Amino acid sequence: MRTKTIYFFSLFLTITMMTGCFHISSGPKPSKSKMTKKYSVTPFNKIENKAPANIVFTQGNVTKVEADGPDNYIPQLIVMVKDSTLSISMDKDKFKNFKSSKINISITSPVLCNIKQRGVGSIYLKDSVKVTDLSI
């Protein structure tokens, strides 16, 4: 009886672990086709990233945002400006356990005073960025 209990417990544990592994790796795989998308945004001075993306910020006279990556990921990006904050995110239901950062986003703005990084990826400040006060 004890052997059967150990056997069933081991089987249950194995199935649970396998199911957990499948759940972690869920989400769409990146396509091999790449695309670039330019976003029309209003001026901002803060960046909040909740997407699995690598961001490169360049200080410049114009405000622009451009993303490149797999053509099945880029259309899922949600890019908007609200209260002077550039917000970058993705549909949580489709990319709940998405851990890859195959998306690259180039951001240019004259002023930057706040950065919030909540997604997988990195934020790089390209060249020199002149700020009075920067909160990260």
What are the residue ranges of the model-derived segments?
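Bacterial N-terminal signal peptides
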Residues: S10-G20
